[in-house]
């Protein structure tokens, strides 16, 4: 039921079509494919590859009922039109709505199914303008990505393989922790426990937006059993605050020390908070923006230190949920039916323990490439580097990139990174295609 457009036959182009693989069919993969169709100015054939889900499946079923973690103003797939999703809501869903008039669509958190419909609409529009493009979808689990003399080979677990000129890895959290598996496991466990006279508690492992959405959906569906939340930090997911627009910062130092970088960020953010009356959310967002700048000067050892000791905490305070969802989650804990318990490893737990964690795995990414995660990093354009050398033909976009660098933690950052990656593909791939 998805799109596939054949390359236009009449007046065949003299420019060979590039073969591009986009691994991951979630929001990051869709944003990347839209960016390709809007900004990549040569014929190409793109494969949207996913181990389990069709493009847009993140909006199906109970996951589609969950609210977006970010407000509409931050969910445009068009970086040159940051209010595009809010305007689409105003024109498509909220025309004449009292809610839209009172509140404005830009501040709304909507069901993910609605965001999916918007993204797919923009996908279709971009595709309709490109007669020199073919889009294919392929369901298969990627086992290995190998660099060959004239391209890259994507090998699947069923033994098949395909060769491409460029590969974009946009798996989100999905290499190690697939969202669909969390929803299915939670639903099955809740149904099983509801049929028992004296059931044990249902344990959800995690403390991010996925945990919040699944927990509240279980309660909305009538599950009345005890729920344990096994979270390393023992904290609820954090709510959104005001943006950090307007905060002014000094020139970042050209430091090669993570300690010096954080001292600069802490001092600048403290001054901005005192001067501008910023909330802690604004300070964290501003700190993330500054860390991305000083990150370029840090040696690999300092980057690895950040990933080992700071990334998990940084992510927890950077990825947030709607204020209403946060309020409902707090009220649920106050009932006593839901409580925090010490963290556990869901891989060694029983069938009533569901993994709801959202932590992209640098180790899983490195495993796909047959490399050591400690040698890898990602630059601002999504280029993947090993030992400081660019791995030609490979880009990493979205949440999976944040396993190797500070961000992107938001969808707007992911979209900007996707467009930078697409603009960077052309010079990388041109020589490879012409010398086939």
Segments predicted by a language model, with ranges:
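Generic low-complexity, intrinsically disordered sequence content enriched
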Residues: 7, 40, 71-72, 79-82, ...
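Flavin (primarily FAD) cofactor-binding/catalytic cores of flavoenzymes
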Residues: 2-53, 99-259, 263-436
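Rossmann-like AdoMet
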Residues: 38, 58-61
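A conserved beta-strand/loop capping segment in the N-terminal third of enzymes
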Residues: 81-108
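N-terminal glycine-rich dinucleotide-binding loop that anchors FAD/FMN and/or NAD(P) in oxidoreductases
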Residues: 62-87, 247-258, 325
């Amino acid at each position: 039921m998805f799109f596939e457009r054949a390359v236009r036959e009449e007046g065949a182009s003299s420019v060979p079509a590039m073969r591009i693989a986009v691994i991951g069919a979630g929001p990051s993969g869709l944003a990347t494919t839209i960016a390709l169709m809007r900004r990549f100015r040569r014929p190409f054939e793109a494969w949207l590859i996913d181990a389990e889900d069709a493009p847009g499946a993140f909006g199906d079923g109970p996951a589609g009922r969950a609210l977006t973690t970010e407000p509409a103003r931050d969910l445009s797939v068009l970086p040159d039109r940051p209010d595009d999703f809010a305007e689409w809501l105003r024109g498509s869903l909220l025309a004449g709505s009292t809610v839209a008039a009172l509140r404005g669509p830009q501040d709304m958190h909507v069901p993910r199914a609605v965001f999916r419909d918007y993204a797919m609409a923009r996908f279709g529009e971009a595709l309709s303008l490109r007669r020199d493009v073919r889009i294919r979808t392929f369901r298969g689990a990627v086992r290995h990505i190998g660099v060959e003399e004239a391209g890259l080979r994507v090998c699947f677990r069923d033994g098949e393989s395909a060769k491409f000129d460029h590969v974009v890895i946009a798996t989100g959290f999905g290499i190690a922790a697939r969202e669909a598996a969390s929803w299915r496991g939670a639903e099955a466990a809740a149904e099983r426990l509801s049929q028992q006279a004296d059931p044990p508690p249902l344990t959800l492992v995690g403390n991010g937006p996925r945990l919040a959405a699944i927990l509240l959906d279980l309660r909305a569906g009538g599950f009345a059993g005890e729920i344990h939340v096994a979270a390393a930090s023992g904290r609820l997911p954090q709510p959104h605050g005001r943006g950090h627009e307007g905060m002014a910062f000094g020139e970042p130092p050209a430091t090669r020390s993570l300690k010096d970088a954080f001292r600069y960020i802490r001092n600048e953010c403290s001054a901005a908070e005192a001067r501008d009356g910023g909330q802690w959310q604004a300070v964290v967002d501003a700190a993330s923006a500054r860390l991305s700048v000083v990150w370029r000067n840090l040696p690999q050892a300092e980057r690895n230190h950040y990933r080992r000791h700071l990334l998990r905490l940084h992510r927890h305070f950077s990825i947030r949920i709607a204020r209403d969802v946060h309020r409902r989650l707090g009220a649920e804990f106050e009932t006593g039916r839901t409580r925090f318990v010490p963290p556990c490893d869901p891989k060694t737990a029983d069938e009533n323990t569901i993994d709801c964690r959202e932590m992209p795995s640098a180790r899983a990414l490195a495993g796909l490439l047959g490399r050591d995660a400690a040698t890898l990093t990602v630059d601002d354009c999504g280029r993947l580097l090993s030992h400081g050398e660019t791995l030609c033909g490979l880009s990493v976009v979205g949440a999976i990139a944040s396993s190797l660098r500070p961000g992107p933690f938001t969808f707007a950052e992911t979209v900007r990174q996707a467009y930078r990656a697409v603009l960077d593909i052309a010079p990388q791939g041109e020589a490879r295609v012409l010398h086939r």
